[in-house]
Amino acid sequence: MFACDAVDLDFLSTAPTRLGATVKVGRPPSEVFAAFAHDPANWGEFFPGFDRTGCYDTPGPHGVGSRCTKRVTGIKVEETVLAWDEGARFAFRVDGTTAPAFHAWVEDYHFEPDGSDGTLLRVAIGSKPRLAFKLAAPVLPRGLAFVLSRAGRSLEHGRWFSTPTSNQRHLGQIAPW
């Protein structure tokens, strides 16, 4: 495991690499927030590259300080929740990965009503990349916009829906679906 720096939300304003994107999602903020925060396995439904083995490693109820593990393109990613404002904000930092992609990483999601029963989803990402990730820098802004738009469409079509859960599967346990 490659450890990452234990940064906080302030890192978003000082990170060497900063990305941002906004997408409209035709679901209420409470539902979009639930898709992102309540069950890490959901990410496999709406983000390309993620599988459905994501799980919280800490007991519920989940919130600031909760830890989870996800897998993206076969890489294990361990995270700590930095912000949890039900229906409005969800943020986390990466604590470690099985690939040396970056020294630090923070993601911050804001879920705002769009005035028509939908959500304006804003994401900010701050990172301190290692060499391999630096090489991908030119495509990251368009890649983030594409991935977030695709996630929004998947959410609109209900490809994730779960209810708040205390997802306590252990790492390596296969999800029942």
Label every model-predicted segment.
Residues 13, 96-149:
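Beta-strand/loop substructures that line and gate deep hydrophobic ligand-binding cavities in soluble
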Residues 1-58, 176-177:
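Hydrophobic ligand-binding cavity/cleft-lining segments
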Residues 27-29, 85, 114-116:
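Short loop segments at secondary-structure junctions
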Residues 24, 54-100, 120, 153-162, ...:
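Glycine-rich portal/gate segments that line the openings of hydrophobic small-molecule binding cavities
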Residues 31-33, 78-80, 102, 131-133:
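Short acidic, gly/pro-rich beta-turn/loop elements at beta-sheet edges
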Residues 22-26, 80, 110-112:
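Generic structural detector for well-ordered beta-strands
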Residues 2, 126-177:
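A conserved amphipathic terminal alpha-helix motif
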